[in-house]
Amino acid sequence: MKKSLVIFCFTLFSLNCFAQNDLPNVNLQSIDGKSVALKDVTNKEGVTIISLWATWCVPCLKELDAINDVYEDWQEETNVELIAISIDDSRTLRRVKSMVNGKDWDYTILLDTNTDLKRALNASSVPLTILVKDNKIVYEHSGYSPGAELELYKKIKELSK
């Protein structure tokens, strides 16, 4: 009985890890306030990194800074694109534009002001990093620790073949 339960749990976990879900087609806002459909800005030629973050989330900022240090190389090698989507609410939304300008990130920055994407992804915490290929979610990771960007890059290279 115990062995059957372990096998069942492993199978369930494996299916969950490898299941490909469609990227939700939600409307977000650009930093300039324009409405943007998420599916219209994902990379049609390869892999897109979608990073859900917030100005108050220290691990989010560390992750985006770490990726920024190597992003140009990643783009040259794999044609990957990154879309950083802020989940800041009305109380902290004002900080997004000035923070992005101060960080000098070379990413597409969008705002999930109504938390439509966060809800559609069932995201309970940030940072949440998702890899998308052909409008399918092919990888998800939540949280950040130094060096996690290297594991992310390995996944990007695998998907870019």
Model-found features: residue ranges?
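Sec-dependent N-terminal signal peptides
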Residues: S4-L15
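Short pre-active-site segment immediately N-terminal to redox-active cysteine/selenocysteine motifs
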Residues: E45-T48, W53-W56, S125
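Boundary of Sec targeting at the N-terminus
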Residues: A19-N21, K34
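A short beta-strand-turn-helix
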Residues: N27-V47
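Thiol-/selenol-based redox modules, centered on thioredoxin-like
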Residues: L131-K161
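Hydrophobic beta-strand anchors of alpha/beta hydrolase catalytic cores
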Residues: I49-I50, L82, T129
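Short, internal strand/loop/helix patches
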Residues: M99-V132
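Structural microenvironment flanking redox-active thiols in thiol-disulfide oxidoreductases
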Residues: K62-G102, N114-L117
